């Protein structure tokens, strides 16, 4: 099997019977200390899609005539991910305020739809932050972000979410609207500062 990394031939020891996953691990070890990670795999000229990756990695490497690995700089990947997360968070602010307006207009069904979108965005952004920190080998609790105490901010976020849950459970839409409009602005601004800090690296 011919192995390439970023279009350059790669001399690598692949014992008979090695799986594509084992070969990928060897290539990943070669990249240690370079600030790069594998971001795509092509087998016989075909890029392996994400939904086929697990199955393909389990197959013997010898089934393919050529295996090409593409790598990218970690810094660039994290920067792009954090910038996109920041855009999503701005959208969540818009949805949050719109949901509050709808609650005040007694349009609770539509408001709940928008609130659900907010929760999905927050969850997505949270996962993005965790993965970005992992790629950069950063301890989030030790991150030095100007004007942001990360530990206190996480506690504040948890408190606000508990308050929203409580308002939802008792059906207090007036309280829920006030929480969405006024009590998440500080949390949101600190989210954005953290995302900007991780993007700048």
What are these regions (language model features)?
Residues 2-201:
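C-terminal-biased regions
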